[in-house]
A protein has these predicted regions:
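Active-site acidic short loop of glycosyltransferases
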Residues: 83-84, 111
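Conserved alpha/beta-hydrolase "acid-adjacent" motif
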Residues: 95-101
Length: 145
């Protein structure tokens, strides 16, 4: 689950800001700040704590290296090489990936379908899990959204 490029336009903060925060305020506080943007209800979301727990399973060095790798990554030229039917899922309130990123995926991945979940942020699978599961199951069974 990713967008076509690492340095995401209009992300809630730049990759460099995330790296700086990681060093200034530490891993757990940075993870909390980032994970809050993944849910409509922020840190009050039902599954917020599992995101924080996952963040605690890494180190500052590993998190920083991941951010460095993300910043440099660009997969736009490879999207057309995806030959499988592809389901693109996006929450209309996502602060990590804007709609332009999603449109780039849809435009450049042949045989792709786009499903937009209303009232969801980045973690569609956790915010509307039943609807998400039905959508994915239908796609796997029928190849359609």
């Amino acid at each position: 689950s990713t967008g076509p490029m690492g340095e995401m336009p209009n992300r809630f903060e730049t990759i460099d800001e995330s790296r700086s925060n990681l060093k200034k305020i530490g891993l757990e506080a940075t993870a909390r700040n980032i994970a809050k943007t993944w849910f409509i209800l922020g840190d009050k979301a039902k599954y917020f704590d599992i995101c924080i727990q996952a963040g605690k399973e890494t180190s500052i060095e590993a998190a920083d290296n991941a951010l460095i790798a993300i910043k440099k990554w660009n997969g736009i030229d490879n999207l057309e090489l995806i030959k499988n039917k592809t389901l693109i899922i996006w929450g209309d309130k996502d602060k990590s990936y804007n709609f332009e990123q999603v449109q780039t995926l849809k435009k450049n991945i042949p045989n792709s379908s786009l499903v937009i979940f209303k009232g969801c942020a980045h973690n569609v699978h956790l915010e509307k899990n039943e609807e998400f599961n039905k959508t994915v199951l239908n796609f796997l069974r029928n190849g359609t959204k």
